[in-house]
Amino acid sequence: MADAKIAKLQSAVAELNQISENEKSGFISLVSRYLSGEAEQIEWSKIQTPTDEVVVPYDTLSPPPEDLEATKKLLDKLAVLKLNGGLGTTMGCTGPKSVIEVRNGFTFLDLIVIQIESLNKKYGCNVPLLLMNSFNTHDDTQKIVEKYANSNIEIHTFNQSQYPRLVMEDFQPLPSKGHAGKDGWYPPGHGDVFPSLMNSGKLDALLSQGKEYVFIANSDNLGAIVDIKILNHLINNQNEYCMEVTPKTLADVKGGTLISYEGRVQLLEIAQVPDAHVNEFKSIEKFKIFNTNNLWVNLKAIKRLVEADALKMEIIPNPKEVDGVKVLQLETAAGAAIRFFDHAIGINVPRSRFLPVKATSDLLLVQSDLYMLVDGFVIRNKARTNPSNPSIELGPEFKKVANFLSRFKSIPSIVELDSLKVSGDVWFGEGVVLKGNVSIAAKSGVKLEISDGAVLENKVINGPEDI
């Protein structure tokens, strides 16, 4: 049955002239793997907590060389790759998410460029920046990178694969059914970074320049900066793959974790966990760390494994609906590739290396006095004594960046804030200070204005009379 489905799908895909032969064969092989049901269930009893040899505490890494020349040699072996396929739609923005303004008028991409530029300048090295775009972000990104033409940085862009969405009903590609637009296609997750790096020719180009490692991270993680200590450790220990993990907080209970399984280190995602063990997976006691998606990978190893077609990561089925048609997109994650590499490790890094901006509540954190901007680096304010960030919940009125910005005359001071919950039609004046636990809920149809200079400490506000 599966064979007949694949044969039928293959002939339909062969007709799709929008994509390359590599993309066609990659897609067919992904669907074949999915249909053969080779997603093995994890045997819960075989899971072991990784030792410090496998997940190395950051503090135990030996210090990097101090002289500039030795550091330059290390950095000349590195390329930085940012995953740039996502759109800013969830935050109400058009175009690539990486061009949302984060702070002081700088976008994610601006900050990334400034950081690498200052590294290249300081050490006289040439760390190139690669942006992996999707067909959703490619055209915009090409225009945007032109503004860095005079920067001291080589920028390369390439596209990740473009696969057709599958119609659930008959397992045929959506574009074959008259869906000519972008919604007939999807980018198959960031696990696709490895074949795309190879197919684009970028991998061989990097190897010919003497590069040995690529540091891969989400473009919206402001904490994912080049770390010489980590690079030095990987080169000295010949680790082909390193995943940065960090201690879980209650906000991260769904994040993937590293386990030792049948003698290899591997990523365990919540989707792979048998129902009976989901609560155990979420517990901070047993699974103490989670994947930041900051990954350091050896380029020769990527080439070897892609050529051998050995990177068979767990498939993540992602059902969607397009114009009332139920479709399926099959995806893979880059972190799941860890088990195919030799001497793969995790490094348990400080939380500061994980500062993602997924929603406007995160934007509030990074635009506030909780952080400072120094040479393109977003650095936490030392005046904050609590190691964890305040928890922030903003209502739907704040969901889009434009609405969020218009509702704050200036971003409040939150250095001493523990939690903030805002719902309804709330507007903040200039120079507001929030401390402790603050909850502000405007009743339906009521506009609630927090006046300039207001100091709210451990307050529950349901109407103007409570301010």
UniProtKB/Swiss-Prot annotation:
MF-aspect GO terms: UTP:glucose-1-phosphate uridylyltransferase activity
Binding site for substrate: 85-86, 190, 218-220
The reaction(s) this protein catalyses: alpha-D-glucose 1-phosphate + UTP + H(+) = UDP-alpha-D-glucose + diphosphate
UniProt: UTP binding residues: 83-86, 97, 160, 189, 220, 358
Keyword Transferase (UniProt): yes
GO cellular component, one term: cytoplasm
SS bond partners: none
Taxonomic superkingdom: Eukaryota
GO biological process: UDP-alpha-D-glucose metabolic process
Keywords of the record: Cytoplasm, Nucleotidyltransferase, Transferase
Subcellular location: Cytoplasm
Enzyme Commission code(s) on record: 2.7.7.9
Protein family (similarity comment): Belongs to the UDPGP type 1 family.
Purpose: Plays a central role as a glucosyl donor in cellular metabolic pathways.
Protein name in UniProt: UTP--glucose-1-phosphate uridylyltransferase
Source organism of this protein record: Musa acuminata (Banana)
